[in-house]
């Protein structure tokens, strides 16, 4: 049972999913996962809690995860996001981690958290069954999400993500490991990060591109509204269709790199401001990367 009154001086202290749901859904509350727990793992494997069919609302002012890991959760709700913030007030979520998360919510993105900042959080081992949404995050036209020092390791399954990875979410110092399909219509463009910034980010994994009709489908990494900055993309891009696909990084405000060895046949890649295409070997050479303006510190 949760303790505390939910104020900044006396936050709610929680250690169960039910108490987390109640406390985090309380507008303006301050919430902490139990900092003194002997174990900080909430393992739902075999639990009667699964499948979870109700989204997890994060409407509190602050949720401090204190390193807690929520594992083996199965979320099944075809018409809702997994984590949602419905408040326009600023919400801070930090150091909370989800492992082995299965989401069957194909009409919605994993997160919908406008006005929320995630710091030091992770979503790993995520299997996402998607068909009609952004893969990861959706802010709003008036309030954007922010992710700092976060990790996203996700596998999307389905006919193809039609909208991209995220919209209206700024990522700084984040790591992505993605395995996903992405579908674009012939003669039109699809955008992986729409109205979203990528600064000091690393993206790895594989994206299987598919063009539905002749007419040169176009895939934009960003749309230029918020260009990349000092980001590194080592993603295996493949073309699973018979039609040519154009890959456009658009532009960056500071040197960003794309590993060209990982771009498959049937994909034509284009230049952009401050974009450097590098070989796999060059991408591992700190001296070379520094020489082209991509800052790397050897350790």
Regions found by a protein language model. Name each.
Residues 1-299:
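Surface-exposed repetitive/solenoidal architectures
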């Amino acid at each position: 049972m949760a303790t505390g009154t939910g104020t900044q001086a006396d936050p709610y202290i929680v250690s169960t999913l039910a108490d987390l749901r109640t406390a985090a859904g309380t507008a303006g509350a301050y919430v902490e996962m139990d900092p003194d727990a002997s174990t900080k793992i909430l393992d739902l494997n075999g639990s009667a809690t699964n499948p979870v069919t109700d989204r997890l609302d994060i409407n509190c002012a602050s949720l401090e995860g204190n390193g807690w890991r929520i594992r083996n959760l199965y979320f099944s709700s075809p018409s809702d996001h997994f984590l949602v913030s419905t408040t326009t007030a600023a919400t801070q979520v930090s150091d909370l981690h989800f492992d082995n998360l299965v989401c069957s919510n194909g009409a919605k993105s994993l997160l919908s958290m406008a006005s929320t900042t995630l710091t030091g959080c992770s979503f790993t081992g995520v299997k996402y069954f998607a068909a009609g949404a952004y893969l990861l995050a959706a802010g709003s036209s008036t309030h954007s999400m922010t992710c700092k020092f976060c990790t996203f390791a996700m596998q999307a399954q389905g006919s193809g993500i039609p909208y991209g990875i995220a919209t209206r979410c700024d990522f700084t110092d984040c790591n992505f490991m993605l395995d996903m399909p992405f579908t674009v219509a012939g003669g039109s463009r699809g955008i992986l990060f729409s109205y979203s910034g990528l600064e000091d980010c690393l993206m790895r994994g594989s994206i299987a591109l598919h063009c539905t009709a002749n007419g040169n489908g176009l895939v934009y990494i960003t749309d230029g509204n918020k260009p990349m900055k000092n980001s590194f993309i080592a993603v295996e891009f493949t073309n699973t269709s018979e039609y040519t696909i154009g890959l456009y990084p658009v532009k960056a405000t500071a040197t960003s790199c794309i590993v060209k060895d990982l771009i498959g046949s049937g994909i034509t890649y284009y230049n952009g401001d401050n974009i450097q295409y590098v070989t796999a070997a060059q991408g591992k050479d700190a001296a070379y990367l520094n020489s082209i303006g991509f800052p790397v510190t050897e350790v």
